[in-house]
């Protein structure tokens, strides 16, 4: 077993300080641009596990390598202005922690008739999004935003490489994935027609609210980009689990060897075929789970296929 299996395990605790960040605390009557200074503090901890297995059975040689890492950080200090409510502070949260409203279902006729809906600062209609009033003042505003979901930077990452060689044939593949990560659907993918002259995405057609789909709808009723309540407000409605597993690369080939190759002045010749981004398993579906919010409204990740010939003289 010892000659086939190897690996390593690392556990780390890191306390970073003097991080360059912008000052935020100043009297309200001072109209100046706050300086960037070395005052930030962030604690990090986590582990990395690497395992490797190599084995040969006659002419058949194979290997499997895997790695798994987990890293979590916490903002210890970032010079925040005093907040009225504890859920508004970024201090104590992870770097890249999303903040937003908590989606509390879609407005119904019964909600409107009851008169008990918090003031969302617009004329709500059935099918509009409604949010939780965290501070109980009966008004939905910035004081009702709180940490939601996981950070935008994955806390869990993993990868697997595997392959074999057998009498000139070779095969290899690479899988990668991440977990405990969230992504906001970008604004251009929330608003019908992208807020302009773009297409209507299939998920919008399938999931939007109508009186007939009120019990199963996953997105608000169709309305324009001006409806900030439904589309612009970041909330748990638009925050998605961006965990994924992706087959990043597969390659298969055959290497020719033999005395006959000397006659054509070749040491060896290899033909191969490869593919990239062939499979992805994820919850996001409508965008690349690896893409940050601002990159989602771009050309999607492509499958790539290659056929090649290597000649060694």
Question: Can you describe what each PLM-predicted range is?
Answer:
Residues 110, 115, 172-174, 181-183, ...:
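Short helix/loop capping segments that flank catalytic or ligand/cofactor-binding pockets
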């Amino acid at each position: 077993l010892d000659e086939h299996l190897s690996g390593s395990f690392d556990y780390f605790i890191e306390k970073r300080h003097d991080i360059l960040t912008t000052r935020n605390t100043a009297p309200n009557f001072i109209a100046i641009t706050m300086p960037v200074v070395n005052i930030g503090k962030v604690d990090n901890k986590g582990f990395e596990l690497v395992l490797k297995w190599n084995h040969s059975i006659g002419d058949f040689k194979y290997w499997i390598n895997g790695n798994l890492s987990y890293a979590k950080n916490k903002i210890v200090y970032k010079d925040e202005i005093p907040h009225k409510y504890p859920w508004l502070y970024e201090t104590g949260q992870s770097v890249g922690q999303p903040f937003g409203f908590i989606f509390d279902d879609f407005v119904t006729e019964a909600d409107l008739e009851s008169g008990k809906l918090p003031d969302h600062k617009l004329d709500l209609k059935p099918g509009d999004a409604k949010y939780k009033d965290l501070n109980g003042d009966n008004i939905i505003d910035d004081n009702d935003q709180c940490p939601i979901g996981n950070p935008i930077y994955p806390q869990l990452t993993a990868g697997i490489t595997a392959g074999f060689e057998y009498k000139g044939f070779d095969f290899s593949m690479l899988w990668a994935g991440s977990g405990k990560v969230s992504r906001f659907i970008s604004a251009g993918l929330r608003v019908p027609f992208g807020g302009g002259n773009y297409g209507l995405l299939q998920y919008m057609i399938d999931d939007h609210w109508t009186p007939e789909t009120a019990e199963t709808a996953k997105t608000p009723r169709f309305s324009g980009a001006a409806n900030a309540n439904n589309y612009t407000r970041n909330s748990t409605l638009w925050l998605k689990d961006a965990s994924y597993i992706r087959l990043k690369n597969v390659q298969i080939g055959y290497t020719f060897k033999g005395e006959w190759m000397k006659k054509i002045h070749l040491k060896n010749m290899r033909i191969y075929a490869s593919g990239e981004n062939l499979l992805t398993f994820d919850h996001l579906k409508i965008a690349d789970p690896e893409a940050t919010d601002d990159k989602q409204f771009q050309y999607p990740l492509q499958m790539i296929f290659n056929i090649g010939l290597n000649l060694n003289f």
